Amino acid sequence: MDKRIIVALDVKEKKKAIDIAESLSDIVFAFKINWPLVLYSSPEVIGEISQYGKVICDFKVADIPYTNSLITERVRDLGAWGIISHSFLGEESLKSVVNAAKGMHVFSVVAMSHPGSDMINSNAMQLMKLSIECGVYGFVAPANKIDDLRMIRSATDRVIISPGIGAQGGDPYTAVLNGSDYLIVGRSVYESDKPELEVSKLQQTAERAIEDRERLKNS
């Protein structure tokens, strides 16, 4: 069974991030890093983490096309496997990310997991249509807002990665059953006394949900 867990390294200490990545390298699908880790260390941390697995840079790129291109090119050159971009800025801005990626996987945010995200989430279908036209690899959709997740899954067969598990209240089984392909989990893993065990439990839950999802689809 494919690995289904993406660990969010939402820490600011480079050594801690690298230690976590090294310990989990064999059992996760990818590592997601955000601006705090880069700003507190250096951009080169992208390449350092990528020695232990795929790195998705959650930079939620959201600027004019030229600036987006510069950000994406640098992330690609540093060795990232994927990058997350906002889609609400429109076609030209999102296309600039896709074009600059040149093989790096682009994930488009079409719905978010935090309170107050209704302005974006209510436009999820329009943002998804735009993102598909721009050629993104996959989508970011919330594990803790099942109606939004289910709606997005019903309209696409592209990859969906989902934050909102654990601290934000999302249930891993329910999220995968309703369309998530990969679960993004942070604090509940790296703050655990046994992070490897936590990832293994989440992986088993995801596998069970995938099996049930396929069974329901074929029934």
From Swiss-Prot:
Substrate binds at residues 10, 32, 58-67, 113, 163-173, 186-187. Pathway: Pyrimidine metabolism; UMP biosynthesis via de novo pathway; UMP from orotate: step 2/2. It is an enzyme of class 4 (lyase). One of its GO terms (biological process) is 'de novo' UMP biosynthetic process. Its EC number is 4.1.1.23. The active site is at K60 (proton donor). Keywords: Decarboxylase, Lyase, Pyrimidine biosynthesis. One of its GO terms (molecular function) is orotidine-5'-phosphate decarboxylase activity. The keyword DNA-binding does not apply. Pfam families: OMPdecase. HAMAP family: OMPdecase_type1_A. Homodimer. This is Orotidine 5'-phosphate decarboxylase. It comes from Thermoplasma volcanium (strain ATCC 51530 / DSM 4299 / JCM 9571 / NBRC 15438 / GSS1). The gene is pyrF.
